[in-house]
Swiss-Prot record:
Biological processes per GO annotation: translation
Entries under PROSITE patterns matching the protein: RIBOSOMAL_S14 (PS00527)
Protein name (Swiss-Prot/TrEMBL): Small ribosomal subunit protein uS14
GO cellular component, one term: cytoplasm
Domain of life of the native organism: Bacteria
Family statement: Belongs to the universal ribosomal protein uS14 family. Zinc-binding uS14 subfamily.
Cofactor binding, per record: Binds 1 zinc ion per subunit.
Pfam family name, one: Ribosomal_S14
Length: 61
């Protein structure tokens, strides 16, 4: 879990666009965040396995 201060810092509007970065909305992880869902790959996988993301199912070919 990220510190509360880091979550607040990431939520602020950056002075320069290159300083802005995404954080997971659930756990606060700064890396491997899926922009479409705004959550990290770990939380995405967990929610997908639990069936909490509508329209998403495991690929099989």
């Amino acid at each position: 879990m990220a510190k509360k201060s880091l979550k607040v810092k990431a939520a602020r509007v950056a002075k320069f666009s290159t300083r802005a970065y995404t954080r997971c909305q659930l756990c606060g992880r700064p890396h491997a965040v899926l922009r479409k869902f705004e959550i990290c790959r770990i939380c995405f996988r967990k929610l997908a396995h639990e069936g909490k993301i509508p329209g998403l199912k495991k690929a099989s070919w």
